[in-house]
Design a protein with these regions (language model features):
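DUTPase catalytic domain/fold
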Residues: 1-212
Length: 212
């Protein structure tokens, strides 16, 4: 069940939802969510000597992103067909019985700006700023400014508190304070250590019908 503005205010009061900094927060609470603002740090992608990025080889991603920090009154230009990692100005903390969902804003969508490619869910127990996968689907560059409303968070109540909230184990993005690049290599390292993708193991997982 998605929380209403009344429920969101109650959870902010109880501490189950925390948003910092909180100045002007009341004005950004909508009927079913909270508007979040754009931070000042961006990761832009650049071509390098690597032919492609290999999720099994962390070195293949070295030099593919460059960090840009801008002043609060400076614009950041998102060019057509460009992918940029950015983060919310606010740090969000949610309890073990709530799930957060990052949504785009219609006003920016009509300019071609999307705020995530796949990562919209923030699991129970999440704590940190939210990394956004900003993209420009339009034909014109678009200027974005730190502090502007960039996305909205909605919240859903779980059927019960989760047993293993995000952060109870080693989670690569927990506690982030700015945009972070992909951590897919950590996942593959864990899988390889467990033997899930090791050559000759679990061959039946990839077997085709009729293979013996």
């Amino acid at each position: 069940m998605i929380l209403s503005d009344r429920d969101i205010r109650a959870e902010l009061e109880s501490g189950k939802i925390k948003v910092e900094p909180s100045e002007g927060l009341e004005d950004r609470i909508g009927p079913d969510g909270i508007d979040m603002r754009l931070g000042t740090t961006f990761l832009v992608f650049e071509r390098n000597k690597q032919a492609y990025i290999d999720p099994r080889k962390p070195d293949s991603a070295k030099g593919t992103t460059r960090q840009i920090d801008i002043k609060p009154d400076e614009p950041f230009i998102v060019h057509p067909h460009e992918l940029v990692l950015a983060s919310t100005l606010e740090r969000l903390t949610i309890s073990n019985d709530l799930l957060g969902r990052l949504e785009g804003r219609s006003s920016l969508g009509r300019l071609g700006i999307i705020v995530h490619s796949t990562a919209s869910i923030f699991h129970p127990g999440w704590d940190g700023t939210a990394t956004m996968e900003l993209g420009n689907l339009g034909v014109m560059p678009v200027a974005l400014y730190p502090g502007m409303r960039i996305c909205m968070f909605t919240f859903e109540r779980m059927s019960s508190p989760v047993e293993n909230p995000y952060g109870s184990k080693a989670n690569k993005y927990q506690g982030q304070t700015g945009p972070l690049p992909s951590g897919v290599w950590e996942e593959l390292d864990d899988e390889l250590e467990q033997g899930e993708l090791r050559k000759g193991k679990q061959a039946g997982l990839f077997a085709k019908d009729g293979d013996s």
